[in-house]
């Protein structure tokens, strides 16, 4: 799925610009995403608001803006809907025998986006399939790629000429 961490960061940067007239960098957007990024507007264990400090985009004077997970959930929703659409499309193209395995075992979320508060719950509720966050989501794709490259005989279907 091509929607993920960088798209979320762009959404946060645009949101802070439009909503708060604040200019923030990609690393600041990443910190916001990691601390208060959420896929749901209501969480059982909500993170505390994050104080974001940055320049006013017109005056360059400092701004101190408290940002809540609800606010970030709202600004990320469009891209999360794209993820949901891609999952739906993928499930629709999945052979029935593999589909049964997916329903039985669930789907593992990887990458930085997997760490969004409430993402696994939102997807589980929507698709009625258990979504899990991988043990090490930031490195699991690289580890899986290494495993596949070390065992090309078992994973030949992943290699294109």
Where is each model-derived feature located?
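Phosphate/ATP-binding catalytic cores across multiple sugar-kinase/actin-like superfamilies
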Residues: 75-103, 148-152
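General structural feature for long, well-ordered alpha-helical segments within catalytic domains
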Residues: 8, 28, 32, 72, ...
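Conserved phosphate-binding/catalytic loops in two-lobed NTP-binding clefts
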Residues: 121-147, 155, 159-161
